[in-house]
């Protein structure tokens, strides 16, 4: 048996990546079911609930990256960041954006490079799929790592607490208020202080490091755990109410910077860090977790294309009830993408640039 933290690798992070990747798949699968269900119907509400409990994926991914890249134990140089991490992400984006563009061209219109021209092709690749925003965001955070490490490694705990407070006020609080009350009023209030955009995902990135290094007190931990079910219920009820009021699906409260999604994400991160970092696992289980964790980027990149294929061929909404349908389709999508990612990742020379 081996410790959950072995050979410099924390199995808690591997498990979190797997769960976060699956939550992203559930999020997008349930979103398709929601779009095809009348607002206020039982199917709409069940699908919306599934959507509400699967919003923690991206914050978890970002906190894991922050905990790893900002750690004192990891050796990081500007050259290594750009030549290995950022360059790899850029190549991954280029490969998959072109693949999505060709896929969409073949299925939705006849692909003809000479007719489209290089400018239209490049533009089409850049905007081939909305979910590629994550790659640009993570590359931006990677670029800031050297500055963040210098600050964080010399900062006192009270300074880090101050940063978290600012993040919660100017990002979490602001976003939540903008969803619940008049946006223009919130803008006017927060615009008085010109640090409204202080954090964005940088807040989650730094928070991952802080939680990993310092943790939280027992009281804060139990408060977080206790608020998770309350937050999930409130998230769902607010979205359901706003959807009924607008007559259309209204998922605004589910934003990554909404207070309830924030609580859910932080509580999960803390729980896995505290529990699974110390758990004893067999070498076989550890190997399985590590390999599947390494496939999560490929799963994230591919699942939209597979989901689109399922939807266009009528596999999404049929006679199967929504909740079992969402779970079944999510599992199928996750497994297929995981298998393909595992194969691509093992290709000599080019595998690391594919997923």
Regions found by a protein language model. Name each.
Residues 11-71, 89-97, 127:
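Functionally critical transmembrane alpha-helices in membrane proteins and complexes, commonly lining
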Residues 61, 70, 100-108, 112-183, ...:
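Hydrophobic alpha-helical segments with transmembrane-like composition
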Residues 216-290:
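Alpha-helical transmembrane segments and terminal signal-anchor/GPI-anchor hydrophobic tails
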Residues 6-10, 73-84, 148-160, 211-223, ...:
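Membrane-interface helix-boundary motifs at transmembrane edges
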Residues 51-60, 72-105, 109-130, 141, ...:
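Transmembrane alpha-helical segments and their boundary/interface "anchor" motifs
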Residues 46-58, 122-137, 179-203, 236-267:
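Interfacial loop-to-helix transition and helix-capping segments at the boundaries
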Residues 22, 26-29, 97-98, 165-178, ...:
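Aromatic-anchored segments of alpha-helical transmembrane domains
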Residues 2-5, 273-293, 304-355:
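C-terminal "closing" transmembrane helix and its immediate cytosolic amphipathic cap
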């Amino acid at each position: 048996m081996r410790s959950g933290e072995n050979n410099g690798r924390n199995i808690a992070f591997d498990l979190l990546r797997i769960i976060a990747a699956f939550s992203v798949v559930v999020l997008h699968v349930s979103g398709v079911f929601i779009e095809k269900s009348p607002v206020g119907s039982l199917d709409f509400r069940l699908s919306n609930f599934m959507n509400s409990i699967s919003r923690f994926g991206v914050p978890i991914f970002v906190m894991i990256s922050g905990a790893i890249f900002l750690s004192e134990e990891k050796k990081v140089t500007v050259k290594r960041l750009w030549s290995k991490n950022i360059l790899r992400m850029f190549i991954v984006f280029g490969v998959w954006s072109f693949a999505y563009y060709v896929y969409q061209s073949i299925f939705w219109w006849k692909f003809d490079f000479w007719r489209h021209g290089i400018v239209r092709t490049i533009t089409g690749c850049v905007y081939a799929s909305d979910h590629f925003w994550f790659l640009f965001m993570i590359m931006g955070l990677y670029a800031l790592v050297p500055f963040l490490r210098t600050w964080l490694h010399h900062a006192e705990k009270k300074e880090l607490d101050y940063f978290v407070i600012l993040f919660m006020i100017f990002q979490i609080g602001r976003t939540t208020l903008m969803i619940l009350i008049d946006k223009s009023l919130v803008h006017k209030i927060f615009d008085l202080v010109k640090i409204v955009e202080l954090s964005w995902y940088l807040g989650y990135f730094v928070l991952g490091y802080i939680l990993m290094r310092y943790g939280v007190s027992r009281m804060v931990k139990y408060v977080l755990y206790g608020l998770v079910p309350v937050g999930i219920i409130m998230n769902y009820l607010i979205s359901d109410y706003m959807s009924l009021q607008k007559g259309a699906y209204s998922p605004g409260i589910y934003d990554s910077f909404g207070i309830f999604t924030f609580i859910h994400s932080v509580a999960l991160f803390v729980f896995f860090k505290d529990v699974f970092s110390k758990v004893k696992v067999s070498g076989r289980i550890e190997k399985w977790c590590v390999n599947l964790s390494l496939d999560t980027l490929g799963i994230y990149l591919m699942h939209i294309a597979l989901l689109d294929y399922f939807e266009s061929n009528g596999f999404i909404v049929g006679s199967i009830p929504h909740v079992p349908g969402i779970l079944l389709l999510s599992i199928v999508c996750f497994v297929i993408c995981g298998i393909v990612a595992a194969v691509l990742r093992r290709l000599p020379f080019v595998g690391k640039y594919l997923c």
